[in-house]
């Protein structure tokens, strides 16, 4: 109970048990998270209480349409007295997601800047871009090295449709390596392109 300034309000669930599961962030997989959820639900069954599992994961991968293997797993684990809640996240000001609806092949391209992490450590170097396109869309993805001094693209290369590792000349003295992989997702039929 909050007694500050004679507050008469109690907490939302004053008789709730709090069950914490620690996972190693560096090696955590969706299977580990699934096992943690199962552990919490098993505890709730043992003590005869309903259960809400809060997942504040900060994960931005996947199609965001409920068809990922993790989303489908979460759906099957929920039921009467068992709810999984996904937190909205702390990235409101970060430009993590971008979308565009194209109506014809003549539409202007979608352009954006991508800032990859630049510290040369194992945990913070690099980055990835996931592109999801609706079934049957014919798309092309190009990468450009943009000069902040000249305010223009210095070089542009088509990276999809193409597969494998490519070395891209970014300027007179700089090169970068990226890997492009793609598939038509067997669950939702959408084209998925991963650039790392």
Task: Describe the function of each predicted region.
Residues 22, 37-65, 87-88:
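Short acidic, glycine-rich surface-loop motifs adjacent to enzyme active sites
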Residues 26-34, 63, 67:
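Solvent-exposed, acidic/flexible segments
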Residues 1-31, 48-49, 79-83, 96, ...:
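Subtilisin-like serine protease catalytic core
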Residues 34-37, 71:
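Extracytoplasmic/secreted envelope proteins and their assembly/folding machinery
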Residues 58-196:
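Substrate-binding/specificity loop regions of serine endopeptidase catalytic domains
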Residues 2-4, 39, 76, 179:
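Residue-level detector of functional hotspots within protein domains
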Residues 1-3, 42-43, 145-149:
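Short regulatory "switch" loops immediately downstream of catalytic or recognition motifs
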């Amino acid at each position: 109970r909050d007694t500050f300034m004679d507050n008469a309000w109690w907490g939302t669930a004053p008789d709730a048990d709090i069950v914490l599961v620690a996972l190693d962030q560096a090696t955590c997989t969706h299977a580990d998270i699934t096992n943690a959820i199962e552990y919490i639900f098993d505890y709730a069954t043992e003590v005869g209480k309903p259960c809400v599992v809060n997942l504040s994961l900060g994960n931005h991968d996947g199609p965001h349409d409920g068809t990922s293997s993790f989303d489908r797993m979460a759906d099957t684990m929920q039921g009467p007295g068992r709810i999984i809640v996904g937190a909205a996240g702390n990235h409101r000001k970060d430009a993590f997601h971008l979308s565009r609806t194209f109506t014809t092949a003549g539409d202007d391209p979608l352009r954006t800047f991508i800032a990859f992490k630049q510290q040369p450590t194992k945990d913070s170097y690099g980055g990835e871009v996931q592109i999801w396109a609706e079934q049957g869309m014919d798309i092309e993805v190009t990468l450009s090295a943009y000069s902040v001094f000249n305010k223009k693209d210095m070089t542009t290369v088509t990276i999809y449709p193409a597969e494998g590792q490519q070395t891209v000349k970014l300027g007179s003295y700089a090169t970068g390596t990226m890997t492009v992989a793609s598939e038509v997702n067997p669950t939702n039929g959408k084209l998925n392109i991963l650039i790392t």
